[in-house]
Amino acid sequence: MTPSIPVVVAGALGRMGAEVIKAVVGSADCMLVGAIDNTPGKEGSDIGLELGLGELEVAVTADFEGCLCAVSQSVRDAEAGAVLVDFTHPSVVYEHTRAAIAYGVHPVIGTTGLSPEQLSDLCQFAAKASIGGAVIPNFSVGMVLLQQAAAAAARFYDHAELTELHHNCKADAPSGTCIKTAELMEELGKSFNPAEVDEHESLAGSRGGRRESGLRLHSLRLPGLVAHQEVMFGAPGETYTLRHDTIDRSAYMPGVLLTVRKVRSLQTLVYGLERLI
């Protein structure tokens, strides 16, 4: 029988972290071994009881590195080591990812906000350590399909704008998913949205953020939303719109579990779910 995959979840009491724990506990080949969260008053409580899953005998801890150290020592086979699933905050995601690699724990990063320079540094660090990991801006298979369609459409349209919509507790803007979509559209090296008029914004930022390629990205934050993205292309006489809507966070769990299962066979850090499917 194949041993279960040891999984640590950081941000365990957050919306995404809680969904990940439910998915891990419900899977046949994963085992929850750590729950990291700094919510006041929760240190030492059983994560299963906190989430209504029954007692799991995994205590909530705020000691990130202490948890990774304990897990790395208990999992002796480095090639098939433990996995960290991180849904925390952009302000700590770089340090969390680097610490996981240093402890020989495979990072699966769902937290967005890494800069291109930080991502490059982490890729080099993981390659030197021969530790596989993944930075996934969006775990939805449907979003991967939208991104692929957007990249294909970018060959034929010179005008395009991207809009992402999220709940009002999301800390970063634009979303990592929106940035990733723009990057895929830009791989041809073309420029978008050639100027037709001399634009003037009476309210700064009205036209969204403009990338070097000319693509414009817009971010909306409202209660009631989960995660949504729209890519609109325009040409004389027509528009072409791609849209993906996540209405429940359970939609991400197949992608999370797929990444957890595959990441231990990697020797470096990959960026994007499309690299794994």
Swiss-Prot record:
Its EC number is 1.17.1.8. GO terms for biological process: diaminopimelate biosynthetic process; lysine biosynthetic process via diaminopimelate. It is an enzyme of class 1 (oxidoreductase). (S)-2,3,4,5-tetrahydrodipicolinate binds at H167, G176, T177. Keywords: Amino-acid biosynthesis, Cytoplasm, Diaminopimelate biosynthesis, Lysine biosynthesis, NAD, NADP, Oxidoreductase. NAD(+) binds at G11, A12, L13, G14, R15, M16, G110, T111, T112. InterPro entries: DapB_C, DapB_N, DapB_N_CS, DHDPR_bac, NAD(P)-bd_dom_sf. Pathway: Amino-acid biosynthesis; L-lysine biosynthesis via DAP pathway; (S)-tetrahydrodipicolinate from L-aspartate: step 4/4. Pfam families: DapB_C (PF05173), DapB_N (PF01113). GO terms for cellular component: cytosol. It catalyses: (S)-2,3,4,5-tetrahydrodipicolinate + NAD(+) + H2O = (2S,4S)-4-hydroxy-2,3,4,5-tetrahydrodipicolinate + NADH + H(+); (S)-2,3,4,5-tetrahydrodipicolinate + NADP(+) + H2O = (2S,4S)-4-hydroxy-2,3,4,5-tetrahydrodipicolinate + NADPH + H(+). The keyword NAD applies. The active site is at H166 (proton donor/acceptor), K170 (proton donor). It is found in: Cytoplasm. GO terms for molecular function: 4-hydroxy-tetrahydrodipicolinate reductase; NAD binding; NADP binding; oxidoreductase activity, acting on CH or CH2 groups, NAD or NADP as acceptor. PROSITE patterns: DAPB (PS01298). Gene3D superfamilies: Dihydrodipicolinate Reductase, domain 2 (3.30.360.10), NAD(P)-binding Rossmann-like Domain (3.40.50.720). Catalyzes the conversion of 4-hydroxy-tetrahydrodipicolinate (HTPA) to tetrahydrodipicolinate. Belongs to the DapB family. PANTHER family: 4-HYDROXY-TETRAHYDRODIPICOLINATE REDUCTASE 1, CHLOROPLASTIC-RELATED (PTHR20836:SF0), DIHYDRODIPICOLINATE REDUCTASE (PTHR20836). This is 4-hydroxy-tetrahydrodipicolinate reductase. It comes from Parasynechococcus marenigrum (strain WH8102). The gene is dapB.
